Amino acid sequence: MSELLWLAQKIVDAYRNMGFVSAVIFGPQGTGKTTYAFKVARDVEYEIRGLRTKDEAWQYVRYFFELPEALDFIQQLTEKDQRIPYIIFDDASIWLSKYYWYKDYMKAFYSYYALIRTRVSAVIFTTPAPDDLAYFLREKGWYQIKVVWNSKKKKIAKALLYAKDFARTSRGDFTTKSTHTAIDFYKVELPDTFYAEYLKKRKEKELELLTQIKFSLSRRDVKNEV
């Protein structure tokens, strides 16, 4: 049996024991955050479904760019009284930014997040910087995983379990120190068909955002003319 990625094993254990895992995967753009999240999901599907190979698991990997789409999916699970092993919010800061804390949907999502474990064993967020996410999500991110290159030439990245230690200086002042523990090494590469579908879906969301930006700018121009 193939070895699972570290985070995948945590999720499998949570799924089988009615537990819950929350993870924020972050790092510079282009280092393989999304790839790591997808490969974790692949390993989870492979293990839970008892598949022969990990390649078979790619067809079951699910992810979301938008909160409304994800909530529709969770509502369907609730209506059917089902529970799934994970849900992935890719580029989570688009909808779940700390700058949107005052919006009604964020307040409602904050309330529901305490109950989400009933339907999902793990919530995975990807973002360039964890500080961009709403505080209540960062606070509840049990695992913060930083992704960096191990060998850019060979397209090998490493996932580091990120933690902050608190200490006191000789003068009694509090200081923080970041620690990083390597948990996984992986190839930043996805199957062609899966990657093509991901790029297509991502492009659709990019165009939607650009349309929203243009609409906002046009409204501003109209106000300036009045």
Predicted ranges, named:
Residues 36:
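Hydrophobic positions on the alpha1 helix immediately C-terminal to the Walker A/P-loop
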